[in-house]
């Protein structure tokens, strides 16, 4: 019997990264300290055997014993300190916030049935909703536990500063994974998990379905080891995040899996971008995550029960296997779907799918929508406070060869002004508030391969309070800011644009001088002193209303491509209060060619004497810190 203290239940000699022997309070303690109790399993145990153990690094306590020893025994630990540990369904928010989150020690844990996260406690000190976080990680592991009914292995996620992003790895036979330390904060960030997800840790965690204890744990097309995890992680993104709720800003990286349109439009446009994952995930958007899980289960159940490999002479990781199992799970003819992905289907498999007599599945999606023929897969769509041009032709992922294409607004959009501009194109101006929405039903009709296709999609519009508007005044014919301000007085702008940051993004005016004016409100997450910075091409000015009237805060007089801590006028420090809205006006004068303007910030704390601009790490002000000027004071957008 051995007791180990530290970050996991392995000795240093068992670790794969054992070439660094130092540690500090800024990182995880190096591996574990093992304490041999000197007992042999052949000897009888006395209830009075007592041992003193301890460690300068603190951490969790683990018992290890020879697996040949099968008799039961009991161990009691005394004088164990309280630590920053969150136990699922045990640790309540009241106890967490009053005692546990500030408990001593530099190691913290989240424990749920099936997984465990271990990292430096500094990552968890600001967490408030411990119950949400433990519930999230239980749900995360439960997806694959349910989808794969064979032996699933409990997994520990370790976050260590020695591990680079490219070195994140899962050791399933050791029941643990290694992650970069900077991934840890995202695992306990409630807002981040909801709005951005956390692909890396989820991916490594889902390796627990594979390994020497799980024969046949790999499945999928050609890359079974990775496909397994990516499909499971995609289900998490669809079910438990609001990533798709921000698709009006575009979805980058892996985030496309959260939305039906974003998953399929590249394939329909002929792009060969991650086709294997997209071929699985689009099924969840059309038929539900339960159907996709049923498809996964069929790789374990139906595949072996019916001996499909012997019956059809196909391999489990072949495209023919996918097309066959997908047809069974969806009760649809998947031959058209597989043709979109350029998948080969063996002739006998193609005939088998045809003989099932299922209707053909056509994966066509509109970006505004959140349902497919009654299956609600998505999220509401954010629109700005002003007029939105709804172009259903441009925003629908559909077969380019489809004919007789029509888009019909069957019902809805009654809480705003809807004006038809041309066929399938409308201008929609909402007249509801930030805490309301407007719904619609869209019919998509077309002909593909001689077959009539009808798809009904529901959608919901919500206002995006964090999307600000700016006006563009063209041909101001001056390179002087004061003259430009005089020129645009009492004039109507040529057109308007929107931004989701405290900026006006890159644009090109050619040889023309133009003036851009953006209005909104600034909000900050924490009270204290903020140093604001400006960079602009070419000239910029910021007016901020802090004390009841607008005052000029920043002024860039010539092109400035990066934030400066030394040029007067390009930075200023102000004291701002949390949950207070500060109106602003941002001016950008472009003297021709490329143009942009952006505001950054550095939080300096609550003590004015500690303000030090030279030590600032400047960050761009993002969407969470700005509001549209039309947002009513105190209005709250619907919670996810």
UniProtKB/Swiss-Prot annotation:
Gene3D superfamilies: Peptidase M60, enhancin-like domain 2. Residues 463-615 form the PA14 domain. Pfam families: Peptidase_M60 (PF13402). Residues 1-288 form the Peptidase M60 domain. This is Antigenic protein NP1. It comes from Entamoeba histolytica.
């Amino acid at each position: 019997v051995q007791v180990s203290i530290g970050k996991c239940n392995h000795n240093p000699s068992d670790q794969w990264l054992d070439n660094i022997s130092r540690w500090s309070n800024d990182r995880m303690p190096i591996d574990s300290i093992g304490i041999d109790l000197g007992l042999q399993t052949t000897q009888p145990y006395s209830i009075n055997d007592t041992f003193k153990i301890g460690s300068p690094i603190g951490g969790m306590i683990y018992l290890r014993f020879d697996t040949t020893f099968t008799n039961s025994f009991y161990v009691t630990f005394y004088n164990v300190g309280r630590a920053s540990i969150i136990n699922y369904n045990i640790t309540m928010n009241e106890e967490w916030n009053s005692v546990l989150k500030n408990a001593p020690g530099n190691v913290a844990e989240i424990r749920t049935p099936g997984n465990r996260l271990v990292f430096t406690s500094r990552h968890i000190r600001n967490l408030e909703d411990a119950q949400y976080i433990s519930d999230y990680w239980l749900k995360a592991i439960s997806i694959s536990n349910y989808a794969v009914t064979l032996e699933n292995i409990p997994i520990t996620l370790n976050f260590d500063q020695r591990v680079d992003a490219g070195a994140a790895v899962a050791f399933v036979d050791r029941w643990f994974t290694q992650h970069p330390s900077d991934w840890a904060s995202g695992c306990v960030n409630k807002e981040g998990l909801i709005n951005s997800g956390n692909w890396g840790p989820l991916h490594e965690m889902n390796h627990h379905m594979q390994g020497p204890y799980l024969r046949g744990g790999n499945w999928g097309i050609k890359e079974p080891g990775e496909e397994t995890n990516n499909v499971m992680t995609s289900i998490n993104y669809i079910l438990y995040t609001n990533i798709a709720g921000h698709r009006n800003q575009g979805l980058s990286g892996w985030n496309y899996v959260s939305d039906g349109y974003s998953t399929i439009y590249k394939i329909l446009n002929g792009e060969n971008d991650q086709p294997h994952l997209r071929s699985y995930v689009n099924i969840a958007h059309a038929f539900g995550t339960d159907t996709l899980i049923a498809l996964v289960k069929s790789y374990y159940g139906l595949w072996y029960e019916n001996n499909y490999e012997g019956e059809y002479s196909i391999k489990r990781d072949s495209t023919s296997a996918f097309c066959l199992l997908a047809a069974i799970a969806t009760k649809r003819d998947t031959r058209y779907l597989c043709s979109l992905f350029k998948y080969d289907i063996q002739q006998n498999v193609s005939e088998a799918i045809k003989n099932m007599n299922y209707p053909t599945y056509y994966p066509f999606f509109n970006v505004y929508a959140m349902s497919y023929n009654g299956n609600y897969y998505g999220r509401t769509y954010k629109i700005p406070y002003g007029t939105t041009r709804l172009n259903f032709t441009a925003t629908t992922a559909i077969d380019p060869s489809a004919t007789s294409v029509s888009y019909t607004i069957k019902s809805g959009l009654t809480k705003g002004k809807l004006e038809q501009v041309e066929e399938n194109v409308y201008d929609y101006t909402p007249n509801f508030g930030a805490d309301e929405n407007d719904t619609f039903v869209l019919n998509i009709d077309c002909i593909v391969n001689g077959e009539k296709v009808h798809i009904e999609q529901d959608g919901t519009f919500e206002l995006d309070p964090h999307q600000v508007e700016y006006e563009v005044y063209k041909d101001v014919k001056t390179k002087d800011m004061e003259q430009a301000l005089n020129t645009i007085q009492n004039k109507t702008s040529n057109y308007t644009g929107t931004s989701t940051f405290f900026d006006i993004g890159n644009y090109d005016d050619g040889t023309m001088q133009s003036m851009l004016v953006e209005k909104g409100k600034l909000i900050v997450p924490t009270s204290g002193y903020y140093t604001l910075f400006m960079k602009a091409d070419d000239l910029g000015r910021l007016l901020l209303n802090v004390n009841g009237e607008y005052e000029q805060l920043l002024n860039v007089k010539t092109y400035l491509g990066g934030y400066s801590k030394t040029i007067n006028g390009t930075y200023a420090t102000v004291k701002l209060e949390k949950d207070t809205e500060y109106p602003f006006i941002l001016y950008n004068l472009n003297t021709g060619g490329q143009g942009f303007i952006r505001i950054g910030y550095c939080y300096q704390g609550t003590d004015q004497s500690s303000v030090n601009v030279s030590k600032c790490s400047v960050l761009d002000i993002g969407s969470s810190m700005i509001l549209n000027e039309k947002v009513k004071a105190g209005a709250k957008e619907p919670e996810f």
